[in-house]
Amino acid sequence: MKMGHFEMVTTLLAAAVLMDIFQVKAEVLDMAENAFDDEYLKCKSRMESKYIPQMKREEWANDALLRMVWDNAEIQWEARKAQLFLPRNFKDTYGIALTAYVNEAQEQTSFYHTFSSAVKMAGLSRRRYIYNFPFKAFHFYLVRALQLLRRPCEKSYKTVVYSTSPDISFTFGEQNQARLGNFTLAYSAKPETADNQRVLTIQTCFGVAVGKFLNKEDDSVVLIPLSEVFQVSRKGTSNDLVLQSINSTCSYYECAFLGGLKTENCIANAEYIDPRYLYNPDMDNQKLEDSGRNNLDPDRMPEIKVLQTEENPLLPDEKPDRSRGKANNPTPGLVPGPKSHPSASSGNTLLPSVMASTILLVASAVNFIEL
């Protein structure tokens, strides 16, 4: 029987839809340029004191699932924190965020997938982060937790951990460097995999042992930050990949909420070169640990520039630091409040009024002319 034009078109469309549904898309291992990777190194104090609290109130009010995940993690954190050695400046909000994330990632919950998908794409542009990333406070707390819990590289690097990914691909070229592009759980036990899975053998400098946050007494589970840079190689003749940390993180964003624009290259983040005290309120003995990161070699990273850490943040009404490279996207205007744009997690009170600044400038000019 001859098929009519309409039936043929319908059949082809149905076939295309089915192919799209059942097709397994390969995950590309690269520098993850679209991931939101702000480390807040120049503005962490200003962000936490002036902006993060309001973001938290608004984001928690707008997301019942986030609120439930946070409340459950807070109960677990309160029960565990007395058993942990923690830096003196490690805050409860950091511990709750870390507890929440590792629990959700371990269980592969809907919150984990929603948050991870949002992080992977929020770095497309600063505008995307400002208007379409409803996890600004949670991301900040999680980043700060990993920063403060990092160990010296010689301690974390010697532990090999493994992660699996379905049909991940990597294109070998001149540099062969990559970032995982998300907050990734890895395990000390090599997993059994199916035929369509690759094993990533990882040696990390910035991964944090989070077993105790999962009620485990060992360091068998490690959480790796999305900004850590790895040298990638192939393991023998297999398709499995070996990721060896170059002892550096890099970011395309720095203080994005305060005006920092996306850079053309991934900028290496300088680490703090100061000791930190690990503190447990139930124990008198303090353990002093050196950060162990005083040798960042920019020559090993020809495409990565080094950003010096300093506590001299951008003011909201200042222009972004152009030394981080030419921005790919223009700075968006004022961030609208939740009433006018529900996906923006910060209200008008967070950023100064352009009109007010203009009036001040005009008034100053008039006074100058009169003088």
UniProtKB/Swiss-Prot annotation:
Residues 306-346 are annotated as: Disordered. NAD(+) binds at residues 101, 182. It catalyses: L-arginyl-[protein] + NAD(+) = N(omega)-(ADP-D-ribosyl)-L-arginyl-[protein] + nicotinamide + H(+). Residues 1-26 form the signal peptide. The keyword Signal applies. Keywords: Cell membrane, Disulfide bond, Glycoprotein, Glycosyltransferase, GPI-anchor, Lipoprotein, Membrane, NAD, NADP, Nucleotidyltransferase, Signal, Transferase. Belongs to the Arg-specific ADP-ribosyltransferase family. This is Ecto-ADP-ribosyltransferase 3. It comes from Mus musculus. The gene is Art3.
